[in-house]
């Protein structure tokens, strides 16, 4: 029932309200008849929200960003299923398809409107997933099966498995878990067969991700997602009394590799690897930017494929461990090492003033006398000549992710420090407090 076979390629999107109201007069009539109830519910939420004891900067940040739910970034088609842009302009949407790795960072909807959030999982696993487990990380609108002619996104697909665990816990319905379980297993098996074919517990084959490139070789960022996905799947499978021996062995290997091969003593890094893999030469594989000039070929031999981060300190270098926490999973990776990574990010990547920071990318996100959390830095040297393309930028989504993770680990003041730095940029004088744009 999740694939509407009546939808044709030529069909246009029909919004949810069109299934409830024939015209604006019916909307107005409903509003008038239910005004008192709607007002009471609105005031109840508002009063409860602002009764919080959270610090003012956190309340402001959450309140401002919750308004996105009432913007054209969020669509809901006629049957109630949700579909989202990454953001929106005055007359257009920005980056279509409820992008799985982008929406990993959004945690409001599953707690405010859990039924709507579950429709995202149902689209990802029932509609946008092929029989071999490949998941298209951008879904079609109207929601319908989509062509599978590009990479799956490792962070989006693995993150989706953790979010199934979260949504099941919020819902509390085992029947929903039983319905989606085989699709989740198919998805995870695809991830293993495609990116960890040697069953090392490591994502090492080239894998697409939120930076719009492919990482080659294991990284703290993606392997933390892998660890979390395995942990979530083992927990769901054991609840359903399945034999999880194979997946638990992979989970143990994944944790061991994270802690002993990707941790440099201070933070988690990437081991760039492009030889002795199942994937072909980096110049030949499908990629957004796979063209190599003569200079690029020289760099390939010297540093490896373009657009990696190597020995850098990546701000979301343990983002999978953060997602595990917010999804309700226990900490699997050594907490002291995770905290050390986060403290390193705060130490090296948080800049109070960006006037001397060179950013050849999208510099308007944060510039001049503003502060911000850089996506990556190389405090110990080893910066690649062609690092991943957004490395010098500042993204609010990652600022909040790192800040909240620091708070989870007990470093509340350092987390608030990042939040304040972010919100200082969006104080209404130069930037719109309701528009922390990234795309």
PLM region descriptions:
Residues 219-244, 251-255, 391-429:
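Extended amphipathic alpha-helical segments enriched in small hydrophobics
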Residues 9-17, 45-61, 176-180, 201-203, ...:
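Short, glycine/acidic-rich hinge or "gate" loops at secondary-structure transitions
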Residues 169-184, 385-389, 393-397, 403-412, ...:
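Hydrophobic alpha-helical bundle architecture
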Residues 31, 35, 39-42, 46, ...:
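Short amphipathic alpha-helical coiled-coil/interface segments
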């Amino acid at each position: 029932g999740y694939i509407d076979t009546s939808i044709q390629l030529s069909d246009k999107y029909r919004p949810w309200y069109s299934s409830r109201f024939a015209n604006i007069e019916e909307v107005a009539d409903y509003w008038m008849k239910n005004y008192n109830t709607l007002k009471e519910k609105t005031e109840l939420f508002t009063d409860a929200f602002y009764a919080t004891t959270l610090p003012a900067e956190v309340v402001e940040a959450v309140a401002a960003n919750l308004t996105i739910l009432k913007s054209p970034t969020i669509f809901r088609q006629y049957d109630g299923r949700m579909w989202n842009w990454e953001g929106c302009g005055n007359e257009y949407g920005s980056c279509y398809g409820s992008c799985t790795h982008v929406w990993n960072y959004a945690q409001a909807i599953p707690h405010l409107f859990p039924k709507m959030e579950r429709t995202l999982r149902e689209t990802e696993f029932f509609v946008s997933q092929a029989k071999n487990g490949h998941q298209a990380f951008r879904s079609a609108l109207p929601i319908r099966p989509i062509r599978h002619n590009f990479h799956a996104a490792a962070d989006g697909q693995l993150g989706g498995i953790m979010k199934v665990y979260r949504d099941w816990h919020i819902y509390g319905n085992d029947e929903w878990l039983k319905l989606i379980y085989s699709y989740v297993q198919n998805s995870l098996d695809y991830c293993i067969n495609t990116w960890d074919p040697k069953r090392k517990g490591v994502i090492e084959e080239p894998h697409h991700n939120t930076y719009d490139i492919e990482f080659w070789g294991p990284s703290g960022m993606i392997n933390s997602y892998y660890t979390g996905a395995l942990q979530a799947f083992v927990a769901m499978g054991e609840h359903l009394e399945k034999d999880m021996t194979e997946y638990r062995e992979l989970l143990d290997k994944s944790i061991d590799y994270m802690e002993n091969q990707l941790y440099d003593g201070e933070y988690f890094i990437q081991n760039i690897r492009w030889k002795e893999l199942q994937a072909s030469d980096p110049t030949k594989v499908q990629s957004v930017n796979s063209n190599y000039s003569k200079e690029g070929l020289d760099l390939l031999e010297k540093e490896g494929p373009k657009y990696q981060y190597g020995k850098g300190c990546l701000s979301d270098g343990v983002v999978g461990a953060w997602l595990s926490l917010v999804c309700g999973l226990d900490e699997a990776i050594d907490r002291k090492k995770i905290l050390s990574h986060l403290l390193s990010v705060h130490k090296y990547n948080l800049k109070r003033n960006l006037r001397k920071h060179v950013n050849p990318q999208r510099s308007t996100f944060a510039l001049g006398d503003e502060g911000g959390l850089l996506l990556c830095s190389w405090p110990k040297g080893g910066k690649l000549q062609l690092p991943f393309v957004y490395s010098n930028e500042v993204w609010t989504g990652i600022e909040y992710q790192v800040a909240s993770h620091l708070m989870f680990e007990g470093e509340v003041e350092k987390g608030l420090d990042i939040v304040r730095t972010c919100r200082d940029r969006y104080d209404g004088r130069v930037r719109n407090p309701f528009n922390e744009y990234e795309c």
